[in-house]
Amino acid sequence: METFFIETLASDVYGKALNVDLDRLSQAQVKYTLQELISYCSALTILHYDYSTLAARLSVYQLHQSTASSFSKAVRLQAAQSCSRLSPQFVDVVYKYKAIFDSYIDYNRDYKLSLLGIETMKNSYLLKNKDGVIMERPQDAYMRVAIMIYGMGKVVNIKMILLTYDLLSRHVITHASPTMFNAGTKKPQLSSCFLLNVNDNLENLYDMVKTAGIISGGGGGIGLCLSGIRAKNSFISGSGLRSNGIQNYIMLQNASQCYANQGGLRPGAYAVYLELWHQDIFTFLQMPRLKGQMAEQRLNAPNLKYGLWVPDLFMEILEDQIHNRGDGTWYLFSPDQAPNLHKVFDLERSQHENAHREFKKLYYQYVAEKRYTGVTTAKEIIKEWFKTVIQVGNPYIGFKDAINRKSNLSHVGTITNSNLCIEVTIPCWEGDKAEQGVCNLAAVNLAAFIRENGYDYRGLIEASGNVTENLDNIIDNGYYPTEATRRSNMRHRPIGIGVFGLADVFASLKMKFGSPEAIAMDEAIHAALYYGAMRRSIELAKEKGSHPSFPGSAASKGLLQPDLWVRCGDLSSSWEERVAQTTQGVLTRKSWWQLRLAAMQGVRNGYLTALMPTATSSNSTGKNECFEPFTSNLYTRRTLSGEFIVLNKYLIDDLKEIDLWTEAIQQQLLNAGGSIQHILDIPAEIRDRYKTSREMNQKILTKHAAARNPFVSQSMSLNYYFYEPELSQVLTVLVLGWKKGLTTGSYYCHFSPGAGTQKKIIRNSEKACNADCEACLL
């Protein structure tokens, strides 16, 4: 595309504000289509991120040319379609208040989307007709979500509709993928995450296949507990036959997942969880593999995600074996012969003989009664786990006892598994009054509160409160695929508020991950997030009542989430002073004591925060994912929408300030695959600040996780990044995380060669843990 027009356009754009007349540009195309211009500008991103910005604006302009110019018209055109997905009630609300909605919506805000963002919106979130033609703009989608939240009940709350639209369209907050593409439709399944517990009887085994398939078809991600299924070759008294164990059942769920895709928009997404004492643990650990005997015999199930539910007892035995203090003996059981091991947990970690350790007590009781069906060592299990992690990045590790002992809902029942991305932890069970866990997710853009004089913690608190009310309304307005999901959600009313853009905050404030000030700020940010959510949930309880399972909860006793960590010995009692100092008095000891007293009177939601992956939100807004460091300073992001070059704009701005963003530096950055650690022309201070997630010591990620985890009601999707697959390195951070009381041991463990050995732009598909994991991505 070597024309005067394109070269002039490129030179005008480079490093400038991009005040481009898109109508004039479109008329001047002559022989080139808008799509060709978009592709060309995107390819020039390596020179400057402004090229990507222009490509995004061209893409938005292209969409605007083919869609309705007002919100009500867009809705009218969709409603007129023979196979319209829109709910008649939603359409009626839009028609009734169309003057307000049409005048308030601001289509110019579409031009704030990144290229990755607008293309993701086109591909996944914007409603289409039966022929696949896009029928709305991003602003229409934001308004549709806002109306779904505040306009579908008994009262149409115009004020809150407009406020929510404003927060969404300015990218201060985001709602989860199912909410985005199902809001306003005839079957509004708005929830992201579902947790199922599979019982050991044929009827329930197949019921869970059906239930998971129905949930997946509506866009939900699923976590299944398999720990209660009897092991292979166990006797079945009813039939006189032997059990097939978990292997065939996992393969059945694997096939179901592949068939039941998420509304045709993306593949289905299931995670299966198992406890380490289960006799079939070694089979379970081999099933995700793409290579090896089971894979060659097609006895694997590689489309599923896998998770281990790890008790303290196993970690203690493993640590003793590592340090030659014990032989690592670990007993294996079949749950039909050793029942309820997955239904109990250790309330304390103490080794004192009177400590409340129900799991440990029952485990050794079954050992004494010789109910075990096999004996191995803790090291053998962890080695087998590691072989699989090297290939596929999981099984995840969830610390069972930490999750349960720090749960506000520990009085409800034992948490036996998590969800697709190991950040949601809700009790679930089958049988009488079955409950299937459900959680609605949203996230706050931390970068939205960066100010010239520091960080706006008050703004973050307010935004967290707004999201809390949004999610609470979604609980009442959403569609539930089963009565057990409705029962659980109405009883506990759990929500999961996450974050994205933490790395953007640190880069803007010139902090580096791992520094004392960064760790303190990480703690303070998540304290503010939790505080804002709890404060608003208390206010909502006064207006609408507490969640039915509130009596007996930790909050009903005046215990906040960080108090549970103090009680367990994993957080110092001085945390309030640290937060007060970091927030410069926005949150004081008095603030927290007032919150405790108010919480005892009632709380609307059983859970408040959960730190999920946020790949889609990050794509849309140009911010870094969740709480993670930058994975690279230059990479190609693979999504369902295609491949897009992403450049770290903060690094570019810092280099421009010192006149170092030159062609030579650009080429070195490209040759190094996005790393600047060996570009010695760049000052050491900048190189240190822009270490990527893989280049920094992984203990830094653990320490940051330990700082924020006390303010997380549920858990977090904690990734680790390593150059080489060395078990000792991985065990170091896992044991450190366990000792610090983390609830998640690991989400994905990524391994790859050093960036300096790569001569092409990093193809960073790992950044989002694969596109099929997006059910709980935002």
UniProtKB/Swiss-Prot annotation:
Signal peptide: none annotated. Its EC number is 1.17.4.1. Keywords: Allosteric enzyme, ATP-binding, Deoxyribonucleotide synthesis, Disulfide bond, Early protein, Nucleotide-binding, Oxidoreductase. The record marks 200, 230 as: Allosteric effector binding. GO terms for molecular function: ATP binding; ribonucleoside-diphosphate reductase activity, thioredoxin disulfide as acceptor. Gene3D superfamilies: 3.20.70.20. One of its GO terms (biological process) is deoxyribonucleotide biosynthetic process. The active site is at 419 (proton acceptor), 421 (cysteine radical intermediate), 423 (proton acceptor). Substrate binds at residues 177, 192-193, 221, 419-423, 613-617. It catalyses: a 2'-deoxyribonucleoside 5'-diphosphate + [thioredoxin]-disulfide + H2O = a ribonucleoside 5'-diphosphate + [thioredoxin]-dithiol. The record marks 773, 776 as: Interacts with thioredoxin/glutaredoxin. InterPro entries: NrdE_NrdA_C, RNR_lg_C, RNR_lsu_N, RNR_R1-su_N, Rrm1. Belongs to the ribonucleoside diphosphate reductase large chain family. Heterotetramer composed of a homodimer of the large subunit (R1) and a homodimer of the small subunit (R2). Larger multisubunit protein complex are also active, composed of (R1)n(R2)n. This is Ribonucleoside-diphosphate reductase large subunit.
